[in-house]
């Protein structure tokens, strides 16, 4: 049986290629280089990062199983998850730099236009009436938690409703921040940096972008993460034994799937 994890990973390479090609105006030679770099990127991620993800998920399951899910415990797990994301980004940016530093002035202008098109589409999405945005956010949040908890109880649903309300405007703030970072990236790319400098800049932009664009975003990120941390603590605190057993089972199942995928050869 093909697991959902394996199914998603099978199409990851094609999805990444399509997303990058949306923003880049590539000739035949550049297209070949891009495909090679994306293949190497996915292989690196499968070999070096997936086993770490599996270890992390098993660790979360172990913590919940022994009752280590107080505020400090959850905070440590969230920080460990952030460290994994940082490790992933630092590992992927060198591959991105290999084809990004080949962009000429007209290619960068093409990329800028595509970013604007994608941004305008997102602005339209966020311009829906507030009650619609709230409903959509609550549905996404509920679906994500139900994937692990199963059916949610009344107190958990109230927690999600409250969290959806207090974080409703965060998407607009994130879009504004992304816009600033994209503009800063385009300006830097126009200086025709070498591969090493581009990798260094990408790491800083993606991991510490507030140092380049808007310093206030760091405070927003910390507050937003704190809200999510509080939500996780309260959701698990109000969970039943059956729900926690389901969370543990789901986490270990994902970990096993990920370990299996990490050991597979890339499909040609």
Predicted regions and their residues:
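Bacterial signal peptide processing site
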Residues: 3-6
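Alpha-helical transmembrane signal-anchor/signal-peptide segments
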Residues: 8-19
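Amphipathic alpha-helical segments
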Residues: 45, 49, 53-89, 175, ...
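Short, structured motif recognition centered on aromatic/hydrophobic residues
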Residues: 20, 33-34, 38, 89-103, ...
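Early exported N-terminus immediately downstream of N-terminal targeting peptides
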Residues: 18-63, 79, 90-115, 156
């Amino acid at each position: 049986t093909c697991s959902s994890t394996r199914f998603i990973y099978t199409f990851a390479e094609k999805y990444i290629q399509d997303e990058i090609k949306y923003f880049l105006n590539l000739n035949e030679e550049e297209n070949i280089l891009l495909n090679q770099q994306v293949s190497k990127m996915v292989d690196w991620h499968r070999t070096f990062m997936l086993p770490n993800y599996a270890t992390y998920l098993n660790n979360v399951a172990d913590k919940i199983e022994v009752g280590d899910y107080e505020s400090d415990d959850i905070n440590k797990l969230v920080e460990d998850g952030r460290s994994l994301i940082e490790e992933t980004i630092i590992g992927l940016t060198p591959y991105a730099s290999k084809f990004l530093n080949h962009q000429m002035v007209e290619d960068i202008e093409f990329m800028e236009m595509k970013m604007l098109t994608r941004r305008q589409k997102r602005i339209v999405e966020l311009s829906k009436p507030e009650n619609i945005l709230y409903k959509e956010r609550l549905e996404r949040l509920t679906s994500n938690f139900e994937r692990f908890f199963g059916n949610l109880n009344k107190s958990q649903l109230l927690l999600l409703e409250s969290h959806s309300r207090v974080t409703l405007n965060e998407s607009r703030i994130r879009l504004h921040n992304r816009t600033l970072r994209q503009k800063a990236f385009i300006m830097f790319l126009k200086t025709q940096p070498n591969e090493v400098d581009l990798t260094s800049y990408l790491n800083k932009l993606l991991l510490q972008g507030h140092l380049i664009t808007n310093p206030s975003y760091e405070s927003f990120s910390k507050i937003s993460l704190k809200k999510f941390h509080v939500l996780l603590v309260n959701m698990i605190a109000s969970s039943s034994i059956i729900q926690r057993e389901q969370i543990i089972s789901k986490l270990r199942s994902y970990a096993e799937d990920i370990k299996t995928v990490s050991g597979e050869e890339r499909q040609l």
